[in-house]
């Protein structure tokens, strides 16, 4: 919702927005704007218009405010840095980018996967440690499968799924059922 507001638990999100804005603006020299609950409705409307026209803004940095009810069909590329495991929310985020628009034959989505640790370190975990990871891993696998299923480059998603399943000793059947059981130490 464009009117979504922050709570005190969202200070990490605010820091992340600030960091991404700083990196894109200062390190990459891009013209970016934040689209958050801190901007008033008039400012948000101006940001959407400038981005849609393509005459100034190269990127919009947002958390929550672009989830539902915001229409910016000109978005061609999205970097989803902090994705949700809520299917409705990630389908809306994907749909936000995939909307048809003039001179937009396709869109590119970079969806960053969040795992509890690097895959090459999983082999050193105890069974109990790996079990604690599995809820997040399971949710990320489901999201990767959903995004990959409809993408033009599904082989990348399939390779990542295979790497994750191999690291955590998750079979295809367990992955499909969602009933993951970690192998032996």
Question: Which stretches of residues belong to each language-model region?
Answer:
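Short helix-loop-beta junction
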Residues: 22-30
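A conserved mid-domain beta-alpha-beta active-site/ligand-binding segment of alpha/beta enzyme cores
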Residues: 156, 164-167
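Short, flexible helical or helix-coil boundary motifs
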Residues: 151, 168-171
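Conserved strand-helix element at the start of the C-terminal RecA-like helicase core
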Residues: 1-21
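Glycine-centered helix-coil hinge/cap
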Residues: 16, 25, 133-136
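Conserved RecA-like P-loop NTPase helicase motor core
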Residues: 31-158
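The feature captures the C-terminal accessory region of ATP-dependent helicases
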Residues: 173-185
């Amino acid at each position: 919702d464009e009117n979504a507001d922050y709570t005190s638990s969202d200070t990490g999100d605010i820091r992340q927005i600030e960091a991404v804005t700083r990196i894109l603006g200062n390190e990459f020299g891009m013209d970016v704007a934040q689209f958050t609950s801190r901007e008033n409705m008039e400012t948000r409307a101006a940001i959407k218009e400038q981005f849609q026209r393509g005459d100034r803004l190269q990127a919009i940095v947002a958390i929550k405010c672009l989830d539902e009810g915001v229409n910016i069909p000109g978005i061609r590329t999205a970097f989803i840095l902090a994705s949700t495991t809520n299917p409705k929310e990630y389908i809306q985020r994907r749909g936000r980018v995939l909307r048809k628009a003039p001179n937009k034959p396709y869109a590119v989505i970079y969806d960053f996967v969040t795992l509890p640790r690097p895959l090459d370190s999983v082999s050193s975990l105890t069974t109990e440690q790996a079990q604690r990871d599995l809820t997040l891993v399971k949710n990320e696998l489901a999201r990767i499968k959903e995004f990959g299923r409809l993408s033009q480059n599904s082989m990348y998603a399939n390779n990542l799924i295979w790497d994750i399943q191999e690291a955590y000793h998750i079979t295809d059947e367990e992955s499909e059922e969602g009933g993951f059981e970690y192998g032996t130490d």
